[in-house]
């Protein structure tokens, strides 16, 4: 396994020693069409306490169950249905992809990083598939794996997962992975993305679109007054994997829940009087919300939240009650003796989908403040000249936001709070559904 790049050389080395580096090819590499499945993707090598990678840091990125196709669609802007379909199986992948380009950039640039692309097997799911593996350094130089050199296994079924393995755990890195295509396949050259200008008029307009309804903001204002007075205030969140922090790197300090809490405390709190309770659990719907609220937020009566953010707009697709469990959770929080403020947050998937049309009427019925991330970001995704943030910049994968996406979500929540404080009489009512509804 060869490192990419040239090693350092100092006067202490032997004078006749040759500097090592990559071997120059006899002929230039053919200019091939390509697309990214990861582009400037933020990763974090979590410490592994057991197993094969014990003592090292690993970032797992799952690509099965349509995730690889979604990555090609969102990050690579691939629209060709034939190409997307081929990514669903190992046989299709082999017929499409000529080589894989990988680069990693991190602070410890000379430290080795191992890239692993694991195929899942038909008979032996995790042990029967091919492992495509190479070692590179964190200096940003691209290493390319040509698939003709890979020894494929007969049990291969579908592309399974990608792993970045770091010798030193708990460090962040930005990674790029792109697929170079075989002759006969073509995709348009990727567009260069602009840096997101958070001070721009366009960014502010995007944030403003998130305010779906102010509702009756009296409880919100009471929370702010309490915080300003230096009294203890608790902000709690209940939701799914986005509230847990999925897609944020590192998860606990870059997620929207932490960012909003920090912004609120910095602007309205005094002497660390604002507390955070984050009860996000991946894959859980509001049907479990009643139980989880008692256990994870109230902590069996030990906690009394002043503001509760409820985020289940992308978790309740399988809810057989069609929103009744969600409404029961909302009314349970509203009817608590301490009368906490309730804020409904509607996140969004990369295909522009959420359950806003089903759940927003609950907020309207009880005159609750509501924030729609879908309304904020999806209209500008389709723009070219005036686009503020691309899907690749906003989404970590098909379901979860990047650090930037989490930042935008936090900014949307803060915008509602600021409007409630500055304009107490405002009441923006929920009106018409957006083009993508819950049945799409």
Question: Language-model segments: which ranges?
Answer:
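Alpha-helical cap/lid subdomain in secreted, periplasmic
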Residues: 20-138, 255-275, 284, 288-427
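Extracellular beta-strand ligand-recognition surfaces/modules
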Residues: 143-180, 184
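Helix-enriched interaction subdomains in cytosolic or periplasmic regions
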Residues: 180-213
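Serine-esterase "nucleophile elbow" of acetyl-processing enzymes
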Residues: 203-279, 292-304
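Conserved small/polar residues in nucleotide/adenosyl-binding loops
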Residues: 430-437
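Hard-cation-handling environments
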Residues: 440
